[in-house]
Each structure stands twice: as C-alpha cells, then as structure tokens.
A protein has these predicted regions:
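Aromatic-anchored, charged helix-turn/loop surface patch used as a conserved interaction hotspot
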Residues: 1-21, 25-107, 153-165
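C-terminal non-catalytic interaction appendages of large macromolecular assemblies
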Residues: 93-165
Length: 165
C-alpha cells in the first residue's frame, strides 16, 4: 500500500497492518495515532520511536511470532510472508549451514529462553552464523537488549516495505 493509503485507513485496519510488522499492540496503537505521516521515513522514524523502549512483555509477544533463523515461516499471514522474504538470503540448501543454524538456534534458546533474532534482510547465512556464535557469549541483559534492537529494526524495515508496495 502507499503511504497515502495507510494514512487514510480506518484505525483498526492501520493497526492490523502494523501488527504484521511487529505484534505489539501498544506500539501499533501509538504509530496509528501518529498518522498522517508526511513520508515513509517519518512513519519509520515514528515506529522506531514508539518501540524504544519496548517492555519485556512486548518483546516476548513479538518474538513469539518470529520463526527460527533458517526455518521458513508457515502460513499465509502478512508477517509470515515478510519473514520468508527477510530470510530469503539464508541458504538452507547447504546441509552444513542448516545443521550449524539448527545447533546454534538450540544452544541460544537453551541459554536465553527465546528464539535468536537478527535482522536477516541483507545478511548472508555466514554473517548470521557469526553473529549467533558471538551473541551466545553475551549475558542475558545484553542479549535482551540485542533482541529488542533487532525487533525495532525489523519492524521499521517491514513498515517501509509495506508502505513502499
């Protein structure tokens, strides 16, 4: 949809479009209430501002909607489609990469209690594996901040993509 179309949507429909970007109700409400936006960049900036900070509960809600890196999101929802597009650069045809991602995902989830989240768009599988390995050495507080930062980046990129369609 275009920015103009987004600006004119009824609030409930704008909120639904935003929830596909990040499943955080307060955030979607705040970005919806900020309309109309003069540019896609203004909308993305408002999305980043509304997401900083997100509460632990909001981060958990958004993380619950993200598949593991290297696993394709299932279903036909807008957020599943966005996730598949974002992970398109992760080559899962290489068995070694797939194995290393699966092992890293398991280790990460055991250590931190949630999926490993990274802005996958524009990153290779090797870059993602490098970050996964590095972030496994973080303490829980640092990693929570990393997850929240990546969620904010993903939400803003998804919104830009939605409003550029």
């Amino acid at each position: 949809m275009t920015l103009d179309e987004f600006n004119r949507l009824p609030p409930e429909q704008a909120r639904e479009a935003l929830l596909a970007c990040a499943h955080v109700g307060r955030w979607a409400d705040e970005v919806t209430a900020g309309r109309p936006y003069a540019s896609v960049e203004d909308a993305a900036r408002a999305a980043l501002d509304a997401a900083d900070p997100w509460t632990d509960e909001e981060v958990d809600a958004a993380l619950a909607r993200h598949p593991r890196i290297g696993e394709r999101a299932r279903g036909e929802s807008a957020d599943a489609s966005m996730s598949r597009s974002e992970q398109a650069g992760v080559d899962t045809s290489d068995d070694d990469v797939t194995r290393r991602l699966a092992e890293g995902n398991r280790a990460y989830e055991e250590r931190f209690g949630h999926v490993f989240l990274i802005r996958a768009a524009g990153r290779s599988a090797e870059e993602i594996l490098e970050q996964l390995t590095e972030r496994l050495g973080n303490d829980a507080e640092t990693e929570r901040a990393n997850a929240a930062r990546n969620l904010r980046e993903i939400a803003a990129l998804r919104l830009k993509g939605t409003l550029s369609a």
